[in-house]
Amino acid sequence: PATANSSGFSAYEEDYAREQIAQARESGSSIVIAYLHYGNEYSRSPNEYQVNISHQLIDNGADIVIGAHAHVTQGVEMYNGKPIFYNLGNFIFDQSNPATHRAYFLNLDLVEDNCTVTLYPVNIINYLPQFMSPEDGKALIAELNPQCDELQVSDAGTGKLTFKLGNTTNKTS
């Protein structure tokens, strides 16, 4: 494991995550984003472990959970009024599997206690993300959206979610 003085990995521990979220809130953070490297490679659906961890993080006060690792996109879920982006897909890899050539990135607009997240679908071509056509973008967002009715799709092929910031779900309060 990583320590203050040596490199390594930081395995998920709910108590430690709860403390970090609380510290962020106490220090005045207006938004808490949990970014995790988790999930099964090349699986288009989040596994039970991902779902459980993501729900715990939201329950403990995170505003957004963002995942990476699977090399493919996974679903989006609204849980207790907060978004979970299980896997964004690839950005710097250019693998031979066509499923790994699709990804999306997020833009967050923060206004007071409101957050609007815009999803921009991209294709990875020669290691470079290229915006998808509106039709392809709509198709990708439709794949992400069965778990998330709140995810709106624009004519331009982007997605949009709006939600309230702040800890409204913390079970420890």
What are these regions (language model features)?
Residues 1-173:
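Acidic, metal/ion-coordinating pockets
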